[in-house]
Regions:
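Bacterial N-terminal signal peptides
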Residues: 3-14
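Extracytoplasmic "Venus flytrap"
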Residues: 22-38, 57-59, 159-162
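Short, polar/charged alpha-helical segment
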Residues: 31-50, 66, 164, 168-172
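A structural preference for short, hydrophobic beta-strand core positions in alpha/beta folds
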Residues: 53-55, 180
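Ligand-binding pocket segment of bilobal, Venus flytrap-like solute-binding proteins
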Residues: 71, 149-202
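A conserved helix-loop-strand patch within extracytoplasmic ligand-binding domains
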Residues: 97-153
Length: 202
């Protein structure tokens, strides 16, 4: 299993709810984030707040919107903040990562609330029949298949492809190389569709 530097998720806020008349809730452009944004919006609405929901934003755009005061709060992944927004690549435990991003983002006027128990970890998937036919059960098996030139094609979301703990470090860790022509970068939802439609192998 390939895990990112951290798997915790927490609400990152730039507003004091006690003093807010209207609260803008942001969300990224994939299903998990849209669900979290909707749940948060409904919860705050039930508490009597006037809520402006703005889900469907790209990760970097959403973060910038919060730093600029356009978004009050959204669910963020501590590993994403550590690596993408604070340029720290050292290996830390989930608790260490949470504490580090909490301190660093506080300097930018952002407050991390208590983390959820949810685990968000990247993984690679194949269609069951194709995996069985190829004898691929682990990332090591996948690396062997690539190195033996089985001609596998991949669909990756843009963030994982570009992350400093994403696609390239994964290839380095398992000692395999996939050419750019074998990798299609697309929105997260389209990744599943491409796999289901047998347009890609992984």
């Amino acid at each position: 299993t390939f895990t990112t530097a951290l798997t915790s998720i927490a609400l990152a806020s730039s507003v004091s709810l006690a003093n807010a008349n209207e609260i803008s809730v942001g969300g990224k452009n994939f299903t998990e984030q849209q669900i979290l944004a909707t749940m948060t919006t409904q919860y705050l609405d039930n508490l009597g707040y006037d809520v402006d929901s703005r889900s469907g934003m790209g990760s970097a755009i959403l973060r910038q919107a919060q730093e600029n005061g356009q978004i009050d709060l959204y669910w963020e992944y501590t590993g994403t903040s550590l690596i993408n927004y604070n340029d720290i690549s050292e290996s830390l435990s989930p608790e260490e990562t949470y504490q580090r991003v909490k301190e660093l983002d506080a300097e930018k006027g952002l407050t991390w609330l208590e983390p959820s128990e949810a685990n968000n970890t990247y993984a690679l998937a194949m269609r069951e029949a194709a995996a069985e036919e190829s004898g691929i059960e682990t990332l090591s098996d996948l690396a062997d298949a690539v190195n033996n030139e089985q001609g596998l094609t991949f669909a990756l979301n843009a963030e994982f492809y570009a992350r400093e703990d994403g696609w390239r470090p994964l290839m380095e860790a398992y000692d395999f190389r996939v050419g750019r022509s074998e990798v299609s970068r697309m929105d997260t939802g389209l990744v599943y569709q491409a796999l289901r439609n047998e347009e890609v192998d992984v």
